[in-house]
């Protein structure tokens, strides 16, 4: 929440309130846009008072790589200045008047604004996938369904990966006491992060099912292969063939450890921020 400008002096008072009343809030697009609208209106008013071009005022004050933000963080990959310069060049900022009337009599004007938004990285997600004794699949994920379709998307990914029928796959209700860790259900990240975690877990499920099928066939695990349509068959004896839905009902699971896999996906290697405590009054 640094904002895009250098602000060497600031004081922020924060208060925490506890309430038993449920809050109504937005699904997307809240917080940053409201604050950005306020500080960009302020920048325009300051520029007008000082008689400075609004673009010039912004370029003089934007944070750049190596600058220290208001919370004490060192800025990295900060390209606000370059973005402003590129936008201004593409719209012909210098050549446009502040206000004009077009051929149809419409009043026109020019404006420019900037803000920065956190990336949500580093970010990690874990899921747990379990093959039940009746051949169905159970996915445990902390990604919350709020209308975006995650309870459909994750089973679809599992169904395609394992070659299973979609109706054989279900999602567990979200409960932080039992579901694996997920950073947040925000930023349009559920399909990408949780989906990749489900994909990893299902690949592990494949290996476990191949091991169980090999026991049933009386062959080594490396002598069976997993087909795209959800069958496990022998390499040297293709007639040895069983569908994964039947592995659970064949009785093998009663004598072996449960088929459970944990999948994890993270983007921590993209950006590694330096460890900082921020700046606050003790």
Regions found by a protein language model. Give the residues of each.
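Cofactor-centric catalytic regions
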Residues: 1-5, 50, 56-162, 174-282
């Amino acid at each position: 929440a640094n904002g895009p400008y250098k602000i060497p002096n600031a004081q922020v008072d924060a208060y925490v309130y506890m309430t038993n009343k449920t809050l109504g809030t937005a699904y997307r697009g809240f917080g940053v846009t409201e604050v950005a609208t306020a500080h960009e209106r302020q920048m325009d008013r300051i520029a007008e008072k000082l008689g400075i071009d609004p673009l010039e005022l912004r370029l003089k004050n934007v944070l750049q790589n190596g600058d220290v933000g208001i919370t004490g963080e060192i800025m990295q990959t900060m390209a606000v200045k370059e973005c402003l310069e590129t936008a201004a060049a593409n719209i012909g900022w210098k050549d446009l008047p502040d206000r004009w009337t077009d051929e149809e009599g419409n009043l026109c004007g020019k404006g420019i604004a900037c803000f920065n938004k956190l990336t949500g990285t580093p970010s990690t997600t874990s899921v747990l996938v379990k093959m039940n004794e009746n051949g169905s699949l159970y996915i445990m994920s902390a990604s919350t369904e709020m209308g975006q379709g995650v309870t459909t998307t994750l089973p679809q990914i599992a169904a395609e990966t394992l070659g299973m029928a979609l109706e054989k796959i279900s999602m567990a209700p979200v409960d932080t006491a039992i579901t694996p860790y997920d950073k947040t259900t925000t930023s349009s990240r559920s399909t990408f992060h949780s989906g990749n975690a489900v994909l990893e877990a299902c690949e592990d499920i494949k290996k476990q099912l191949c091991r169980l099928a090999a026991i049933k066939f009386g062959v080594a695990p490396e002598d069976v292969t997993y087909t795209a349509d959800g069958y496990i068959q022998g390499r040297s004896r293709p007639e040895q063939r069983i569908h994964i839905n039947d592995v659970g009902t064949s009785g093998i699971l009663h004598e072996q450890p449960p088929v459970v896999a944990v999948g994890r996906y993270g983007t921590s290697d993209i950006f590694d921020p330096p460890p900082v405590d921020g700046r606050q009054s003790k």
